[in-house]
Amino acid sequence: SAMVVKYRPDLAGFVTTNHRGATGGGIALLERIGAGTVDMGEIQIHPTVEQQTSYLISESIRGGGAILVNQQGNRFFNEMETRDKVSAAIIALPEHFAYIIFDEHVRAKNKAADEYIAKGFVTSASSPRQLAEKLGMDYHAFLNTLERYNGFVEKQHDDDFGRTTALRAPINEGPCHAI
């Protein structure tokens, strides 16, 4: 991670899904014998990695109909954009993280969600209000976000961020979940 931070200081503190041996030692060795490097700041990161365990949360959750919200309970970006763009949007948030929000409909259609629940990554609640309270976010903003997103699903057009894929079903079937 020292090499990552050397070239991308904005990634300080973020965990990696790489194996422990991926430290850049080979690059450092080659530099010592005179090799040049290019584009070292071009580091691909995944936007949804559980930050305590470095466990990658599959894109299939977002693709199944989940949304991303910030600590205030608001959507802030097109969840289905490319990894680099979604990651950059999350890094730009003051809190540097986002919640993946989904309901029972998404959970039932995505086996990975049950794995995340079993591993303890998921916060669940019987209602959006209870979920917002558990996450320490403003319930009214969160409910407005869900209502607005559900309207986009109904008309199959995201007026806010231009999401054109995975507008599968409204997020309204309890329990509600967050990673």
Give the positions of each predicted feature.
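Conserved hydrophobic/aromatic pocket- or pore-lining residues that grip, position, or stack substrates
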Residues: 1, 30, 142
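Flavin (primarily FAD) binding-site architecture
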Residues: 1-8
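A short acidic, glycine-rich active-site loop
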Residues: 10-22
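Short linear motifs at secondary-structure transitions and domain/linker junctions
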Residues: 11, 41-45, 72-79, 152-156, ...
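Intrinsically disordered, low-complexity segments enriched in polar/charged residues with Gly/Pro
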Residues: 11-12, 52-56, 179
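Short alpha-helical basic/polar micro-motif
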Residues: 21-28, 140
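An anion/pyrophosphate-binding glycine-rich loop and adjacent beta-alpha core
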Residues: 27-137
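A glycine-rich dinucleotide-binding beta-alpha-beta segment and adjacent secondary-structure elements
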Residues: 141-179
